[in-house]
C-alpha cells in the first residue's frame, strides 16, 4: 500500500508522496510525516553492523516509503545519494562521531539534498 503523508499541524489531512515531495511544506506550515513507519525487521537488526551506509539507508527508506516508490528505483536513489564516505571516527572509548562532510559540497546536507533531488527526478 502506498504511503500517505500528513501535516504535523493537520493530522487528518493526507497527501501522496508526489505532493509531499513537490510541495515540501504543507499549506499550514507544518511538516510532512508518514502515516505509518513499519518497524525494521529482525534480520536487519541481526545484520546491521555488516551493512554499508547505502544498504542501511535503503532498508530504512523501504519502511518509510513503502510501495510509493518501486523497490529497485528506491534502491538506486539511495545508492546514488549516499555514494561517498561517512566515516565513524573514534574520539575515545565509547565516544564516536559520524563525519557527514565528505560529500560534494563538504556539508551534512549532501545526503538529504541528493536524496531529495533524485526523488524529485523520479
Place the predicted regions along the sequence by residue.
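PLP-dependent amino-acid enzyme catalytic core
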Residues: 1-122
Amino acid at each position: 500500500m502506498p504511503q500517505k503523508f500528513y501535516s504535523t499541524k493537520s493530522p487528518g489531512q493526507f497527501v501522496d508522496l508526489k505532493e509531499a515531495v513537490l510541495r515540501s511544506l504543507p499549506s499550514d506550515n507544518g511538516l510532512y510525516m508518514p502515516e505509518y513507519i513499519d518497524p525494521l525487521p529482525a534480520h536487519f537488526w541481526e545484520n546491521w553492523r555488516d551493512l554499508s551506509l547505502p544498504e542501511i539507508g535503503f532498508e530504512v527508506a523501504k519502511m518509510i516509503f513503502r510501495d510509493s516508490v518501486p523497490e529497485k528505483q528506491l534502491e538506486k536513489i539511495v545508492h546514488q545519494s549516499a555514494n561517498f564516505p561517512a566515516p565513524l571516527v573514534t574520539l575515545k572509548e565509547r565516544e564516536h562521531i559520524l563525519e557527514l562532510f565528505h560529500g560534494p559540497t563538504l556539508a551534512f546536507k549532501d545526503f538529504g539534498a541528493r536524496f531529495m533531488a533524485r526523488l524529485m527526478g523520479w
